[in-house]
A protein has these predicted regions:
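Conserved hydrolase catalytic core segment
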Residues: 68-70, 75-96, 104
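Catalytic nucleophile-loop/oxyanion-hole region of alpha/beta-hydrolase
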Residues: 6-9, 35-65
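Short alpha-helix in the alpha/beta-hydrolase fold that links the catalytic acid
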Residues: 182, 196-205
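Short beta-strand/loop motif that positions the catalytic acidic residue
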Residues: 180, 186-188, 192
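Conserved alpha/beta-hydrolase
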Residues: 11, 16-40
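Catalytic active-site module of serine/aspartate enzymes centered on a nucleophile-bearing elbow/loop
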Residues: 210-242
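Active-site nucleophile elbow and catalytic-triad environment of alpha/beta-hydrolase enzymes
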Residues: 158-176
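The conserved beta1-alpha1 loop
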Residues: 2-4, 74, 188-189
Length: 242
């Protein structure tokens, strides 16, 4: 499990409990700059560092687990997962899962702001900006939202370098989606207010039959933490059983 921007692996305990009845164990990491891992909060020098982290983590899990390892990436972690798969470094992996991959933002970013971020990525790469995530949009369960807000390991930072690296990686993964040679499942909430589900639909359309897209009616950004999450866990288990 590779988490999204500003969060950490501990937020996936609900996911782990949901998949356990299907005989599946969950392993998760904190990307550098997140959770208990070292590094400036919300910063990465290059997208390749997160790809390195993911490849090393998958290899570690393969050394621990007795069965098939199926990587899953959520939101920003979904883009990292796509980059890692396309890099060819996830040896022995046959398929993977994406949850609300952050390919397109729901709120359009003005062109001037994107250009400014690219410039600042070169001039002041560690400049910390607010990631502008509205906690009320992560899911529809008040207790989960409250826990997200009060979680000391959740942060609201994104550096100018990370923003520029993410934008480049998201565009690159969409452009080269036809080259993905592994089967994968895409989960996207129809009412996601952070990430535009149109990005998932475009990815699916470009993958030449390698992906299965499941649009989750009424779900917000975090389907594993939202209402009726048991249905999502069952859908993943069903896909894995094919």
């Amino acid at each position: 499990m590779v988490h999204g921007l500003g969060e950490h692996s501990g937020r996936y305990e609900r996911f782990a409990r949901g998949m356990a009845p299907f005989g599946m164990a969950t392993y998760a990491l904190d990307l550098r700059g997140h959770g208990l891992s070292a590094g400036q909060r919300g910063h990465v020098d290059s997208w390749g560092q997160w790809v390195d982290d993911t490849a090393a983590f998958v290899a570690h899990v393969q050394g621990q687990a007795s069965g098939e390892v199926v990587p899953l990436g959520h939101s920003f972690g979904g883009v990292v997962m796509l980059s890692a798969v396309r890099s060819g470094r996830l040896k022995g992996i046959r398929r993977f899962v994406l949850s609300s991959p952050a390919l397109k933002l729901k709120a359009p970013v003005p062109a001037w702001k994107t250009s400014a971020a690219r410039l600042m990525s070169r001039l002041a790469p560690r400049l910390a900006l607010d990631n502008e995530v509205d906690a009320s949009t992560v899911c529809r369960i008040p207790e989960v939202v409250s826990a997200y807000v009060s979680d000391p390991l959740v942060h609201r930072k994104i550096s100018s370098r990370l923003y520029a690296e993410w934008r480049r990686a998201a565009d690159d993964n969409l452009e080269h989606a036809a080259g993905i040679a592994l089967r994968f499942l895409i989960l996207a909430g129809t009412d996601d207010r952070l990430i535009d589900p149109a990005g998932s639909q475009e990815l699916h359309a470009r993958t030449l039959g390698m992906s299965e897209l499941k649009m989750l009616d009424g779900r917000y950004h975090e389907p594993f933490n939202d209402l009726a999450s048991d249905e999502v866990f069952a859908a993943i288990a069903k896909w894995l059983g094919k």
